[in-house]
Structures are given as structure tokens and as C-alpha cells.
Amino acid sequence: MYKRQGLGEPLCWIAFGPLATAAALIVISPKSNFDAIPWGTALIVGAGPAMATTLVLFCSHFHQINQDAAVGKKSPLVVLGTNRAANFLPWLVGLIFLLELLPVLNGVWPITTLMCLISLPSGLDLIKLIKRHHNKPELIKNSKFSALRFQTINGLCLSIGFATSYFFL
């Protein structure tokens, strides 16, 4: 019933963002209080990394947009087309960094989490690849791996930033 409706990316963000982060926060909480799910904290902590995960799904469809459209899928790429999706990609990568920068600027995250900026060159490489070859399936078929590289570096550096913040207090 809900297949092929273009809900994969939003559901991916919700599942890997607020839901997964809220579950992790509940598990590490010193008290078991399931009545007070920390949705605000989960949203702040999980939004950027979840958007990076969603980016992998978004980029995995560039090479198969014609096949997706032929079977009636309404993925964001089918709806936007490859050119508009390629032009949207820099905004998506920028949003990831914004979602990871705002908690630092607001004093919620330690400054060491800015290590996530190390992933910027990988994000720029992904943007260049897709902008240059968005309509050439044979050249873009590995874009999901470039997106995965960005997501991995971004998440790893963010995690290291959180882990090392203790040493810089």
C-alpha cells in the first residue's frame, strides 16, 4: 500500500535520527523513565547524522531513475529529475553541516565536534561528481559509495569529537 510513494528518505531520517537517538538516550539514561522520552535532545543530536545517512539513500537512485520511474516509484529523484536533484545536493550537504554546527554555536555540543568538518572535502567531491554526471547512469552508479564515504567520515569525526571532548574541558 505504501510502496513506491517516495517516503524512503523521510522515513530513513526519522528512523536513524530522532527515533534511534531517543532509544540510545533512554538506554544510557541512569534511570529508566520511559514517560519522559528526550525528543528534543534526540532531535538535536540525531538530525545531522541522520541527514547524512539519508543522503546515502538519496544518492543511490541517480543511476536508476529511469527504471524507478518506469515501475511507478515516486522517489525524490524521480519527482525532481536528475538535474534538479543535483542542484539540490549542495543544499542537502550544507544542511548536514548546519545541523551539526548549530548545537556547537548554542553551547549544546562541545567545540571538538567541529571535527565533522573534516568530511567537507568528501562532501564536495560527491557534489562535483553528481553535478558533472547526474544524467550519465554509467558514470554515476557509484555515487552511493561516495555518499557513504562522506557519511562515514562525517559520523566518525563527529563521534571522535564527542569522545575527545572530555580531554579538552
Give the role of each language-model region.
Residues 2-33:
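Intramembrane alpha-helical segments
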Residues 3-5, 57, 61, 65-66, ...:
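C-terminal ends of transmembrane helices
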Residues 11, 126-155:
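Interfacial loop-to-transmembrane junctions
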Residues 12-22, 86-101, 152-158:
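Core segments of transmembrane alpha-helices
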Residues 35-59:
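Membrane-embedded alpha-helical segments that form the functional core of polytopic membrane enzymes
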Residues 37-41, 91-138:
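Transmembrane helix-loop-helix
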Residues 50-94:
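Solvent-exposed interhelical
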Residues 160-169:
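Juxtamembrane boundary at the C-terminal end of a transmembrane helix
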